[in-house]
From Swiss-Prot:
Cysteine disulfide partners in this protein: none
Gene Ontology MF annotations: chorismate synthase activity; FMN binding
GO BP, sorted A to Z: amino acid biosynthetic process; aromatic amino acid family biosynthetic process; chorismate biosynthetic process
InterPro entries from the UniProt entry: Chorismate_synth, Chorismate_synth_AroC_sf, Chorismate_synthase_CS
EC id: 4.2.3.5
UniProt cross-references to Pfam families, sorted A to Z: Chorismate_synt
Protein purpose: This reaction introduces a second double bond into the aromatic ring system.
Protein name: Chorismate synthase
Gene giving rise to this polypeptide: aroC
């Protein structure tokens, strides 16, 4: 089972990630991992931090000659901004001068609950670890799982479908045609847009929404769609709650900072219709191949993959740090006071899509390993090809 942990503070020396459980023999390159980190840093509406950092993963263990060796993969991403925080974020040395404590929590952030939970008089430690800067380490970890899956013919990609009131307008038929070439083809096209949207009209409206929010000292959220192609039928299980693929994917997406809602397929629209209008029928083609003309279930039925494209949506709330502050209070004096501003983005929805790709990758990889087993890439690949051949034969109508 692939598991990972991250460590590090937003303005500490570095972020780190350890990925455990990766099979041996998986081809990985530092260029591919760093490409994912670069994708995370893109996007219109980002703040000053992205002008400072150029994220690169330094691999410390678990890879030899471009292939995994079955031991934990350890990676470090240096924080270039650390040089400006060596006193404020010193690990051991006591500052010669008192550093003012941060005592005003931001509405919508982890500040208040984290400060009370862990007994801090200063909110700074909460800010440092709850920051979305941590997602850089998760993107590096998820990149390893993404590359493992890609080598097996499974691709993960994302697009932005809404920023504020700006909505993606690309016809579903056109999107489906792109997905026929794999999820990465869609993501690659989205990456050409500063807001990772596919249509020019939606891009223009999204940029205008971000500009308006910035001019007003505000922030704006949005929606990202994640697609996973190449997943065969039968990953996941209905047998126990903790083996349900949809539950694991939703949990992974909700673990991302500021993601507050998840949809699988057209779930919320489905909820307002009759069953006869919702469920995806089984239709045999003239050649006897089993087909599904629709995919309203989003590629998951009974908590298992259906063999169709897995389609997930994640709703990202507007970022909590506002230049125009909301009302708050001082936890030291308990007096009302406007909230404070911590350097932040106006919009990070484009980056959220890249993070979403990263966090769902280990979920799919683990579902694959649970189904097929294997400690080395070659045996896993062989078993997957045999399973795909079995499915093709099993689901073919005999004449």
């Amino acid at each position: 089972m692939i598991q990972y942990v991250t460590a590090g503070e937003s303005h500490g020396p570095a972020l780190s990630a350890i990925v455990d459980g990766m099979p041996a023999g998986v081809p990985l390159t530092d260029e591919a991992i760093n490409h994912q980190l670069a994708r995370r840093q893109q996007g219109y509406g980002r703040g000053g931090r992205m002008k400072i950092e150029t994220d690169k993963a330094e691999v410390l263990s678990g890879i030899r000659f471009g292939k995994t060796i079955g031991s934990p993969i350890a990676m470090v991403i240096r924080n270039r901004d650390w040089q400006n925080w060596t006193t404020t974020m010193a690990q051991f040395e006591q500052p010669q001068e008192a550093i003012p404590a941060i005592t005003v929590p931001r509405p919508g952030h982890a500040d208040l609950a984290g400060c009370i939970k862990y007994g801090f008089e200063d909110i700074r430690p909460v800010i440092e670890r709850s920051s979305a800067r941590e997602t850089a380490a998760r993107v590096a970890a998820g990149a390893c799982a993404k590359l493992f899956l890609k080598a097996l013919g499974i691709e993960i990609g994302s697009i932005v479908t809404a920023i504020g009131s700006a909505k993606e307008e690309m016809p579903q038929q056109e999107l489906a045609a792109m997905l026929a070439h794999g999820a990465e083809a869609v993501a690659t096209q989205a990456d050409q847009s500063p807001v990772r949207m596919l249509s020019k009209s939606a891009e223009t409206a999204a940029i205008a929404a971000i500009d308006e929010a910035k001019a007003n000292g505000d922030t704006v959220g949005g929606i990202v769609d994640v697609f996973i192609t190449g997943v065969p039928l039968g990953f996941g299980s209905y047998v126990q709650h903790n083996r349900r693929l949809d539950a694991d994917l939703a949990a992974a997406l909700l673990s991302i900072q500021a993601i507050k809602g998840v949809e699988i397929g057209t779930a919320f629209d489905n909820a307002c219709k009759y069953g006869s209008q919702v469920h995806d029928e089984f239709i045999f083609s003239e050649s006897g191949e089993l087909t599904r003309p629709t995919n309203r279930a989003g590629g998951i039925e009974g908590s298992m993959s259906s063999g169709q494209v897995i389609h997930l949506r994640a709703a990202m709330k507007p970022i909590s740090s506002l230049i125009s502050p909301l009302q708050s209070f001082d936890i030291a004096s308990m007096e009302p006071i406007p909230s404070r501003f911590e350097r932040s983005d106006t919009c990070a929805v484009p980056a959220a899509g890249v993070v979403a790709e990263a966090v769902v990758a280990p979920v799919i990889a683990n579902a694959l390993l649970a189904k097929l087993g294997g400690d080395h890439f070659s045996e896993i690949h062989e078993r997957l090809e045999a399973y795909r051949a079995y499915l093709a034969n099993r689901l073919q109508r005999k004449s």
